[in-house]
A protein has these predicted regions:
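Signature of extracytoplasmic/envelope-associated structural regions
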Residues: 1-136
Length: 136
């Protein structure tokens, strides 16, 4: 299987392509481990997978221009926004899946940085519902 180096990831938030203003993306999916151990089970605990608890973490390069980062994210605070993440900006396919989901925009840091540094904003938003993976 081929290795991949992320150099051209594609990320949209609320229908706006912000790929050129994002330095890092992490889409994480986990499942609760629900214990099912019953009386008579003496060797070990048993479990089944429960509800998904997914999240997306993005590191933005802040941009206050019209149609860019701040203008896109600020109005979404407190709402559920459509997000699309692909490893590469090219056509969706078996080697470039598209992950589509709604994220609850629970946090935003519009101003962050020190003297002489790039203004950035790192966020982690919970996924609101399921993640859909498309390969065609």
């Amino acid at each position: 299987m081929a290795k991949i180096v992320l150099t051209n990831a594609y990320i949209t938030v609320g229908g706006v392509d912000l790929s050129d203003s994002i330095a890092s993306v992490s889409l994480s999916t986990t499942r609760d481990a629900v214990e099912t151990t019953a009386f008579g089970s003496t060797a070990a605990r048993t479990r089944v997978a429960g509800l998904a608890d997914n999240s997306v973490t993005l590191e933005f390069h802040q941009d206050f221009a019209s149609g860019e980062v701040e203008a896109t994210i600020y109005p979404l605070i407190g709402t559920s926004a459509a997000v699309v993440v692909k490893p590469n900006g090219s056509v969706t396919g078996a080697t470039n899946p598209s992950y589509t989901f709604n994220a609850l925009v629970t946090e935003w840091t519009p101003v962050n940085g020190a003297v002489g540094e790039l203004a950035t904003a790192s966020i982690t938003w919970p996924v609101d519902g399921a993640i859909t993976k498309a390969v065609i």
